[in-house]
């Protein structure tokens, strides 16, 4: 996301579309949802490329990469449904936690979302190098929203080659 901020600052007066968006829209960025996992990645992969996905909550699975809760699996929507894409095993890489929003990080994101009336959301999923757009249930937004989601994601991906699509399209489950 650092490139997004930098582009906004450097191109504000040069890009009419960008200037319009900044002047007439609210944009919110949450650059890191998993600060403990982020710091742990820096420790285990100081040159970058760390792919530790869990926070650092003690789940009695040692002190390595099996420790913690996968925050992407700890949100409320169909959390743990059919055990697809997540696990109830605390030592699993995709452990979803004891219950939806059991982690302070996901609770904070939930509360932030509930306190804002978002019209659009683009999810930057750094673990898999994805830009995930609506919807997360396997369906697609109606036009022109689908095209808008894809155009925004493709413009961002032009700078880093990330995949753009829904969670179902990108990783095979939602």
Predicted region positions:
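Short, well-ordered alpha-helical packing segments
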Residues: 6-9, 30, 110
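Alpha-helix capping at helix-to-loop junctions
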Residues: 10, 35-38, 77-80
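Metallocarboxypeptidase
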Residues: 47-174
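Short, well-ordered secondary-structure micro-motifs
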Residues: 40-42, 133-134
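Short, small-residue-biased leader/transition segments that mark boundaries at the very start
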Residues: 1-5
């Amino acid at each position: 996301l650092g490139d997004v901020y930098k582009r906004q600052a450097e191109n504000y007066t040069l890009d009419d579309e960008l200037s319009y968006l900044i002047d007439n829209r609210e944009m919110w960025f949450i650059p890191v949802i998993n600060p403990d996992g982020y710091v742990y990645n820096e420790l285990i992969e100081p040159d970058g490329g760390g792919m530790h996905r869990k926070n650092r909550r003690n789940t009695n699975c040692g002190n390595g990469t099996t420790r913690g809760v996968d925050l992407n699996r700890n949100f409320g929507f169909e959390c743990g449904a059919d055990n697809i894409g997540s696990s109830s095993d605390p030592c699993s890489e995709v452990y979803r936690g004891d219950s939806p929003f059991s982690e302070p990080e996901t609770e904070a994101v939930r509360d932030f979302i509930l306190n804002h009336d978002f019209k659009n959301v683009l999810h930057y999923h750094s673990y898999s190098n994805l830009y995930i757009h609506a919807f997360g249930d396997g369906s697609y937004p109606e036009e022109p929203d689908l095209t808008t989601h894809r155009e925004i994601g493709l413009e961002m991906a032009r700078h880093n080659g990330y995949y753009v699509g829904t969670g179902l399209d990108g990783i095979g489950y939602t």
